[in-house]
């Protein structure tokens, strides 16, 4: 018996079946960096149209988490796909380096500035700490396969960037957007200073709970707003009732907040002293119960919106206050009307800004009422609560009073209760130079430009526009000053007596920026005023405040994008961050861009959702559901993480768990197996000498290349629309269905058994080559490591890296006018699906083993029969049976198997012919050829003759 194995073209490749990514990816990374891959991409793309994705800087503190990974991977997918689309797309990663979290870490290590270390030493320690954090995060970002200028990232603490931040501030001052005002901050009366959110802890505390009457100025006008029955508007004075747990803030009251959409009742209280009270309709019974009022009824109702700007008398001062509307008003407790003191609460401040209410602050830094505070001067606020209650009682304004225990903010150092207190701050005004209106116009422009240029809104997903629009419409002036040590100085000089800015502030800020560019922000604190102000030095103070860190990152379009040479002066095309950044970086960048240049700093804004576990819960160490990107990379590899990111619809919450990642790993294996089949069957193929011209190729091979061409068009469009889960779906479908379930199955016989250099086999290899060239590029933005691995093993001359290439342009397909066109093969696929079902039944009934044991009869109506007969004897290769005969439907026996098609019945029989040892087909001529008794005539031709001819399959 002869052994024909050596006559077969068995697949062979160095591309392993197992990715073993966790072990092998680091070596690939090393090669990328040893060979300066990022530089190679820049050189290859030089002179192409630019696409700039500006990196929103993560904060330089702590390890990267799964959300960071999602963000960086999405950016990397876009950058790489833009490169393939013919753009020069440099990527400069950045870090946000100033601010409180780093200060707190450094305080824990060296103590507070001004205690054990000087402020200058403290800043130096902060800089050093930020550097260590950046290095750790950088290592993890690089490990994700993210390509960028990691050797030269931008840091907001680089001297040049710090200087440019000051220059950005100078431009805003020059354009007239800056003003000085007051803003409430957490204030510790023991520290005598403002506290940041992170310095506040919550403990239980006893506080007074009071309901207070504010009497209406115009009772008839107020009553008229309610839908009372005619002539039944009640009797007695009308009061709006507010509830508060901080009576000491009532001296600063400047308004009563109600909710526009809530129903309010005008309540008649009966008895010896009748009165009418305004309360939220749902809370009337609660208020009456706690006030001990039994006889009452509702006279009428009005929406909060109808009561806007009605005026009520302050309970103990001789002025009146308006009703204002705010979304912070709820029915959770109280009366539905909220005491509003803009100097003592953040929500009060925001609503107060909207209505132009005075930001009154009668309280000094030590928690004592200022000397000019009527009734309460010199009292400590917490001790004054009792005095306020006493005054309210005397004036007949107190409806109810009790003491209750609740959670209250305390200073983390002193463990003592804190207050909200308005302090002088610097603001970017939303109104004084029309900033709000221009920002809203830019939001609209971004949407419209996107539709014109890309067929979709510049806000991706489109709901992002409404979100940021609502925020801009309602946002107060931006408080940009902070009383911190580690931050970019606001760099202003103010007159000691008038508190006015120096008339040459803009020039002076540019002078400060020059010094900061040389030696960093410490230059400001080391600066002797006389150096810049000369003889005026004694008249002016240096403002000690630092800039809000959101100003640092929000001005990077100017301090980084405008400054880096690789961006060639082009503005950013895209900003891409998590959905929390509508309030954060997207907002601060928009405000600064419009304030500086009258233009948004981006053309497109892409938003991704947050990561949650498989049950939709937030990641939490206490729940134990945290998925660490480092763990995923160490176990499964970065390409699995990247495939998960791409496969997930990022427009909503992104679910991740071990089980979900396992599914990504399974999908990855299917794609890898397809790639391995392509490479293994390109063994011995040299495109320079073995390529077959399209006109000479076997028809099904041209069909397969045509399918790749169609899929490539869909994939390119999906990349352009940032629809990455669409890309992965199309790639999976192509690998699993069109290739795996059909084409790669059909060609195995020809690929393995045809003469090695025959047209039949070279045609097939030509198709596989074109498909592999296209597919490796589709994969490259997402499964970058695997694409690099495939690229290195593809035959033919090529550059070192797939990432310097563009989409493959060598694809072609069948012409629509051909008989065996795409529609023909689509029908063949449905017929094959029906045949497979019939073969499966026969296999289940033990009538056949493999499909090659089957002889198939297809009973077809004339039109289908004609199409099937177009494949002649090659129909059996398409259906993977040893024989396939097409017969008129009229000849179908009663036991023919019906199919889901109304023009096809099938009959499956076991072949009586012997099996060819080489191709495994059952053929009558096996055993009839002298010297080759074990194989069929077709195989003899392929082994000894010129090789078989294939036209169709």
UniProtKB/Swiss-Prot annotation:
L-isoleucyl-5'-AMP binds at residue 577. The keyword Aminoacyl-tRNA synthetase applies. Its main location: cytoplasm. Its cofactor is Zn(2+). A motif ('HIGH' region) lies at residues 58-68. One of its GO terms (biological process) is isoleucyl-tRNA aminoacylation. Its EC number is 6.1.1.5. CDD domains: Anticodon_Ia_Ile_BEm (cd07960), IleRS_core (cd00818). Zn(2+) binds at residues 916, 919, 936, 939. GO terms for molecular function: aminoacyl-tRNA deacylase activity; ATP binding; isoleucine-tRNA ligase activity; tRNA binding; zinc ion binding. It catalyses: tRNA(Ile) + L-isoleucine + ATP = L-isoleucyl-tRNA(Ile) + AMP + diphosphate. InterPro entries: aa-tRNA-synth_I_CS, aa-tRNA-synth_Ia, Anticodon_Ile_BEm, Ile-tRNA-ligase, Ile-tRNA-ligase_type1, Ile-tRNA_ligase, M/V/L/I-tRNA-synth_anticd-bd, Rossmann-like_a/b/a_fold. PROSITE patterns: AA_TRNA_LIGASE_I. Belongs to the class-I aminoacyl-tRNA synthetase family. IleS type 1 subfamily. Monomer. Catalyzes the attachment of isoleucine to tRNA(Ile). As IleRS can inadvertently accommodate and process structurally similar amino acids such as valine, to avoid such errors it has two additional distinct tRNA(Ile)-dependent editing activities. One activity is designated as 'pretransfer' editing and involves the hydrolysis of activated Val-AMP. The other activity is designated 'posttransfer' editing and involves deacylation of mischarged Val-tRNA(Ile). This is Isoleucine--tRNA ligase.
